Amino acid sequence: MSKLRFFQSLLISTVICFFLPSINARGGHSDHIHPGDGNYSFHGIVRHLFAQEEPTPSLELTRGYMTNDDLEKAMKDFTKRCSKISRLYSIGKSVNGFPLWVIEISDRPGEIEAEPAFKYIGNVHGDEPVGRELLLRLANWICDNYKKDPLAQMIVENVHLHIMPSLNPDGFSIRKRNNANNVDLNRDFPDQFFPFNDDLNLRQPETKAIMTWLRDIRFTASATLHGGALVANFPWDGTEDKRKYYYACPDDETFRFLARIYSKSHRNMSLSKEFEEGITNGASWYPIYGGMQDWNYIYGGCFELTLEISDNKWPKASELSTIWDYNRKSMLNLVASLVKTGVHGRIFSLDKGKPLPGLVVVKGINYTVKAHQTYADYHRLLVPGQKYEVTASSPGYKSKTTTVWLGENAVTADFILIPETSSRGNQLRSSCDCSCKSCGQPLLTQFFTETNNGITLTLFVVVVFLCFLLQRRVRFNLWKQRQSSRRSITV
């Protein structure tokens, strides 16, 4: 009977595998850093190049730009016009009480899905307003084209895109870099090298709103839009000794890849004579501390770029259409990169068949990606054209490792983890009495030579049949994913 119970256990495990939740982690068309840990903070150290006081833009120059009220109305009008693929929400308020509005674009806005999330933030500095104008144009372009343009459709169906045109509405209203408390918001985040000011309550309301936002939503990647140069900037932004030199983060290759996506899609960013390929490591350009970019990567688990998208901080409004034309393709391709490449998947427990929030690491890269709490989906951005050893783990379960060759298209790698002490293992042990001479025989041989042959054979046939159905299901999923050029692996 103990052997019969073993096969019953085997049958149950197979059924669980067969009926695993059918939600796929979408994100693809064919000491260790643990993001989210720690609570360091700091008050900013001046980044000399753009932190210098500059003349306030004239009132004449601001004509043609949306006021804060204009922007709010435009965002509300947008979500009414495009209600099927968008929603409007606020993550908090500025010092002067203006809502920090965000537009979410997705085929299922407001719902939790096993998809990567991307955020764009504009107007971090009040006197750099181009981003707020371009981000609203981006939202409208996607709304107008997602039914007819493949790239727009890909983004709507496979990504949750969050667009915040203005993080610093107070600074914009007075045409100044800093917020209403005269604090540079891009120097107000926790920093890995200078953890001064550990009191969260001493941070600016805009900063706290961003930090809370990233606790609520697990973003895969992000970009902030700035003005005053033409370059895609990536981590690290600072160095431990405050000197200026190239200081690479663990995912340096991936960040360079993402930065090149933007610069090479841009009309002329990659042609820069100052920055090779139109990209730069922040610390090699000029170090800053307390920046949003590094904080996103360390504490938020989010790959963020700082995009300088116009040589002039506050160009004439008549130039906005040209700047939009130069940046539109770059902005779209950067978001689409989340689903075009990388390794994506979900983690399950074998014993219960449920999503298992865990950790994913890649050998040789000192960085950990966390799977989402709800669907246990993960989205690991990596450079195409390389082989990676990917490991999934979760407390109380045996880790699993697989080798992935990442070509030009994304790969799905789902992991099914076995408990450290599984019920099946206990049944195996209980079925073997050390005083029994036959314990050395193969288990299946024992079954087929004892009196339970008929029942055992029936169970065996059922298990084989379910495995056959499971293989067909996997092949069908692979066929569907191949239609979008995505490979799939189950480990």
UniProtKB/Swiss-Prot annotation:
Its main location: membrane. It is a single-pass type I membrane protein. This is Carboxypeptidase SOL1. Binds 1 zinc ion per subunit. InterPro entries: CarboxyPept-like_regulatory, Peptidase_M14, Peptidase_M14_domain. PANTHER family: CARBOXYPEPTIDASE D, B (PTHR11532:SF57), PROTEASE M14 CARBOXYPEPTIDASE (PTHR11532). Its cofactor is Zn(2+). It is found in: Endosome membrane. Residues 26-452 are extracellular. Zn(2+) binds at residues 125, 128, 226. Residues 64-338 form the Peptidase M14 domain. Residues 1-25 form the signal peptide. The chain crosses the membrane at residues 453-470.
